[in-house]
């Protein structure tokens, strides 16, 4: 019912979600879990910068209702410009009060005439959010909050000290690769590349083997670079077009294919990451792709971030 992160059948997804929550409740000794938190992501998710400006004529308090209005305006701006997308989340980036920039939201005692609010907007196809909602309608569960994946990973992985000093998260997913850089209360940089581990497997498939075998070879024997191959083993893989035929795949050939796609995906992200190296103290690598043999070493060779 879910294929590479895409919901194909909402009714089946609803049943599976309900069953997973039942098993989880049993595991943690709860009678029932009534609330759920979900993360949203995928190839359709994009990042956009948006801002709103207000002239209060004279210096006076920047009240919360004004900030709420500015946030709502930013959301409307994006959805008016791109009717096919929905704003999945709107995260404050920074504020400008009378020409002075600050990371934190204005405090009750701050006064300003000219107020700017800058946001990072996570947007995706409208059906992305709707399919999640439809799936949960078929379960007696309530979605308490939907997080975009970069924000959820930030809360899950980074400590308060990391947030204060600055941190980066590289999420190596199946269909997308996302780099997020965060410091204080501000996203310094966020970019989603619509390629991931699935694209690596499709490249390996071009050797004349099936996609499931390509995925298995990548996960069990693949390396992030040819230099990391210690023994150039050869793997006999069944050929889909011949009942008794097989394809011989060398470990170095496998690594070369993987490395080529990784370079295409990661080179621009690593270049951008290095521009922020002096502003962050730690880089987290997560997602299924992070488990590829030699991935940590591969990343370390391309960046000066710890």
List where the protein language model places each region.
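Short glycine-/acidic-enriched loop or helix-start segments at secondary-structure transitions
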Residues: 47-50, 179, 295-296
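Acidic, glycine-rich loop-and-beta core segments that form the ion-binding/anion-interacting portion
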Residues: 160-226
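Residue-level signature of catalytic and energy-coupling elements of molecular machines
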Residues: 38, 136, 171, 204, ...
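C-terminal structural cap/anchor segments
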Residues: 243-306
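Generic beta-strand/beta-sheet core signal
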Residues: 39, 149, 172, 182, ...
């Amino acid at each position: 019912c879910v294929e590479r992160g895409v919901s194909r059948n909402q009714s089946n997804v609803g049943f599976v979600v309900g069953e997973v929550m039942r098993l989880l409740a049993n595991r943690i000794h709860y009678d029932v879990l009534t609330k759920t938190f979900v993360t949203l992501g995928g190839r359709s998710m994009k990042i956009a910068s948006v801002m709103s400006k207000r002239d209060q004529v004279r210096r006076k308090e920047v009240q919360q209702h004004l900030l709420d209005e500015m946030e709502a305006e930013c959301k409307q701006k994006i959805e008016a410009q791109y009717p096919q997308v929905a704003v999945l989340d709107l995260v404050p980036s920074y504020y400008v009060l009378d020409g002075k920039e600050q990371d934190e939201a204005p405090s009750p005692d701050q006064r300003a005439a000219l107020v700017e609010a800058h946001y990072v907007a996570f947007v995706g196809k409208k059906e992305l959010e709707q399919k999640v909602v439809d799936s949960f309608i078929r379960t007696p569960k309530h979605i308490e909050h939907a997080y975009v994946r970069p924000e959820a990973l930030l809360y899950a992985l980074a400590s308060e000290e990391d947030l204060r000093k600055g941190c980066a998260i590289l999420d190596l997913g199946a269909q997308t690769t996302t780099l997020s850089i965060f410091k204080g209360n501000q996203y310094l940089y966020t970019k989603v590349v619509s390629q991931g581990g699935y694209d690596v497997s499709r490249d390996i498939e071009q050797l004349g083997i099936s996609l499931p075998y390509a995925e298995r070879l990548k996960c069990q024997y693949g390396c992030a670079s040819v230099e990391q191959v210690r023994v150039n083993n050869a793997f006999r893989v069944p050929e889909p077009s011949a009942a008794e035929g097989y394809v011989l795949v060398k470990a170095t050939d496998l690594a070369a294919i993987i490395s080529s796609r990784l370079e295409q995906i990661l080179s621009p992200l690593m270049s951008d990451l290095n521009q922020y190296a002096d502003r962050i103290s730690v880089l987290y690598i997560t997602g299924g792709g992070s488990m590829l043999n030699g991935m940590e070493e591969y990343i370390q060779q391309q960046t000066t971030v710890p």
